[in-house]
Amino acid sequence: MLIYKDIFTDDELSSDSFPMKLVDDLVYEFKGKHVVRKEGEIVLAGSNPSAEEGAEDDGSDEHVERGIDIVLNHKLVEMNCYEDASMFKAYIKKFMKNVIDHMEKNNRDKADVDAFKKKIQGWVVSLLAKDRFKNLAFFIGERAAEGAENGQVAIIEYRDVDGTEVPTLMLVKEAIIEEKC
């Protein structure tokens, strides 16, 4: 399995256990789903928790958690402050600079850096469109929540797929590293 980690904080943000695709060689999109499960239980995509012993509600006082499977599995923390467009703009400006600095420090080709700048600016403008921005949710990893700076904000957009609301997590490719586990 591949884990996708933040290059700045080392937070686990997603994994290849979720359906994913790379869009415009810029953003990984991971499809999640809403789940209800026992607190702390991790269910990998493709498994069948209802077929497992004890999956039915037995009326006990066990805590259950509800949410998006990607968020729960990777212990992401919701950041409501970014729901204000001006706060998000301030964050994304600093984040883009940090990613570009990281690319240059790692001797990335100038053409690659310039292409990234152009693509990321277009993507950010599309996110900030009023009809789209209001449907976004923002999450960070555990270390970023504990005060580690410069971490990537995982953005979830709720998309209509065949009449079903599908939470889609977006991560900037240049700000994550793949790690085999």
From Swiss-Prot:
Keyword Cytoplasm: yes
Subcellular location(s) per record: Cytoplasm
Keywords of this entry: Calcium, Cytoplasm
GO cellular component: cytoplasm; endoplasmic reticulum
Entry keyword annotation includes DNA-binding: no
One annotated GO molecular function: calcium ion binding
Protein origin, superkingdom: Eukaryota
PROSITE patterns per UniProt: TCTP_1, TCTP_2, TCTP_3
UniProt-listed InterPro entries: Mss4-like_sf, Mss4/transl-control_tumour, TCTP, Translation_control_tumour_CS, Translational_control_tumour_p
Residues of the signal peptide: none
Annotated TCTP domain residues: 1-181
Function: Involved in calcium binding and microtubule stabilization.
Family: Belongs to the TCTP family.
Protein name: Translationally-controlled tumor protein homolog
The organism of origin for this protein: Caenorhabditis elegans
